[in-house]
Amino acid sequence: MSGVLTASGPSWIAPFTGLSPRQFSKLITASRREGADPVRKGRPWSLPLEDRVLLVAAYWQTNLTLRQLAPLFGVSKSAADRVIDHLGPALALQTRRRFRKNAVLIVDGTLVPIRAHTVAAQSKNYRYSTNHQVVIDADSCLAVAVGRPLPGNRNGCEAWELSGAKDAVGHTTVIADGGYRGTGLVIPHRRERGRAELPAWKEEHNTSHRKVRARAEHAFARMKTWKILRDCHFKGDGAHHAMLGIARLHNLTLAG
């Protein structure tokens, strides 16, 4: 059974990973160092690590079913499933533990439509979704933390606390939108009751705040080009692993 897609053909790398061949090579080297390609007991993998990483990225990028995707790599559906189960978690973004002095982070939530109703709930878009809290660095726009998914009907305040995103950033300054009221994060000023408009200095603060916060929205827009985040059919931790892996690939793309 011969496949069509392989990482040995550089032309396949960018469409499915968003990375240049050089960036992809860095990812493979880092993955090996992190233990993503251990010596297995029993039957060895039928694909080299490079092709397995490409398979996982292609799955996230295209959202093809495994029956559709597996033949493109010359493997069975069950083999492709094992590759994704093994490598999905191994490609995850590692939460940053320390931040530079005076760092400013941005948090926002995004809803990922998901078919596994055991981990989802109907949200404002009337679809079953999970709420993912993503934290990015305001200067570099790199993702630094991704919270565990919660049912999509949880608001930003709850999700910030319960997803683990709050614990991941410690006491670092974090800005957010008005949905995070009462969390201690830096949010926009609101009009006081009985006042028609905000003082000029508060309006200026809000304008600046909005421009910085837009960087998170742009990061989400780039991440949502991965089709798995528009209609996810993973069960269990699959959606979380996909979000973490896509965040890592997003960072590699930006870092150059």
Identify the residue ranges that each predicted region occupies.
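A cross-family signal for key residues in well-ordered alpha-helices
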Residues: I28, V56-A57, E161
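Short, well-ordered secondary-structure "scaffold" segments embedded in the functional core
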Residues: Q68, L72-G256
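Glycine/charged-rich beta-loop-alpha catalytic/anionic-binding loops adjacent to active sites
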Residues: D37-P38, D51, W201-E203
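Charged, often Cys/His-bearing segments associated with DNA-binding zinc-finger transcription factors
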Residues: M1-G42
